[in-house]
Amino acid sequence: MAVSHRLGHVALRVQDMERAKCFYLDLGLRLTWEADDWCYVQWPTGEGIALLSPDHKAAGPHFAFHVQNRAEVDQVREQLLAKGHSCGPVHDHRDGTASFYMQDPEGNWLEMLYEPAGGLPSNIGAEPIPLTYS
């Protein structure tokens, strides 16, 4: 099953959001999205890390392969199902992204994700959100 994709992001559960955020910003990543229970830091080349607070419920720790278009999300899912893998349903999100989650044979969660060009700040390398350090 050859699919054009790239490793786009990794999502990590963190206990101290501010401490984790400062660590990754000090490494040179930029803050491109921030919400109450998660944030997204990104290299200028587009790869990023989603930092998830203990209260974040939408998704847990995982890594994501970014595919080239919306049709590939369905194509990859169908190919995986045909090979006997279990996959969650495809979700079309209000921001134009589409994805599904699954586990590899070792139980690691992964996401197959399409992000349209010009979408959320997490996928366009937007300017960082100003932070106040204490």
Kindly give the residue locations of the regions a language model identified.
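N-terminal beta-strand motif that seeds the catalytic metal site of vicinal oxygen chelate
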Residues: M1-E18, F63, G118-S134
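Core segments of cupin and vicinal oxygen chelate
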Residues: S4, A11-I49
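Vicinal oxygen chelate
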Residues: L7-V14, D55-Q79, K83-S134
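Short acidic/glycine-enriched loop/turn segments that link adjacent beta-strands
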Residues: A35-W38, A58-A59, R94-A98
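Solvent-exposed strand-loop boundary residues in beta-sheet-rich modules
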Residues: T45, D55, P116-G118
